[in-house]
Amino acid sequence: MKAEETSPEDILKLKFKTDLGLGARANIGMIVLSSDQTLELEFRTLLNFEGVALYHARIPNQMHITEKTLAKMETELPITASLLPDSFNFDVIGYGCTSGTTVIGEDHVTKAIRTAHPGIIVTNPLTACKAAFRALRVKRIAFLTPYEPSITKAMRNNLIEEGFEVPLTASFYESDDFVVGRITPNSILESVKKIGVRDDCDGVFVSCTNLRAASIIEPAEKYLGKPVTSSNHSLAWHLLRLAGILDNSENLGRLFNQVI
């Protein structure tokens, strides 16, 4: 029989059932930078809990990271957020850029995303890291970034304004986001050890979702004897907790045994 002669009566109609889908417990939406090489891979581990689903959309950004290029993302946020379908019933949506949040502003990020998803719970790595350190009862932070000085200083000032102490700040001084994604985990680990060993800090924060830091959290904590977190690490934890997922994990560092 030719294709044009096919009719519905020629196809056996079968019954089916539906369930709550992959996100039976939580549906998490993420806005990921187009230049990011790392976030999705690390989130596969950090959000690997039964009934938790992750859906992401990529936001246009420039590979060269400056305050000016970061600020341009504010107008793109509502457009990118609209690519995450309302029908998925998201519990929370995250914006995956620590430096971008610093430049644009946490409240502005939330407002932009809520343009597409009114009333949705929103978080980002900057908000998440502060929530993480409060949950861990860490006030004095050793701070590592890959950024140029102006961005690093702006982020440090934000932490200080929120009541944290930042006795030591260090950076890789790299503004090319492609290169940032290629910085080795061992380079990050050795840097965390170097800055975190000081007695005047209670924990370490590794900023930037493009740095491959999730895998070094546990060895760094074991070496230093104090909490360590990163942009992706704290953001994943915050997304889970805001979505009502309170599961603990024995292999994701101290933070994943904390509630908000």
Segments predicted by a language model, with ranges:
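N-terminal glycine-rich anion-binding loop in soluble enzyme alpha/beta folds
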Residues: 2-80, 149-152, 156-184
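Glycine/small-residue-rich loop that forms an oxyanion/phosphate-binding "nest" at active or ligand-binding sites
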Residues: 80-127
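Conserved beta-alpha
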Residues: 109-116, 120-177, 256-260
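Periplasmic-binding protein-like
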Residues: 90-96, 142-144, 201-208
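Hydrophobic alpha-helical
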Residues: 189-221, 235-236
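Short, well-structured alpha-helical segments in soluble
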Residues: 74-87, 187-201
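C-terminal functional extensions of proteins
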Residues: 229-260
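Hydrophobic alpha-helical segments within soluble ligand-binding/sensing domains
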Residues: 75-78, 82, 122-137, 233-245
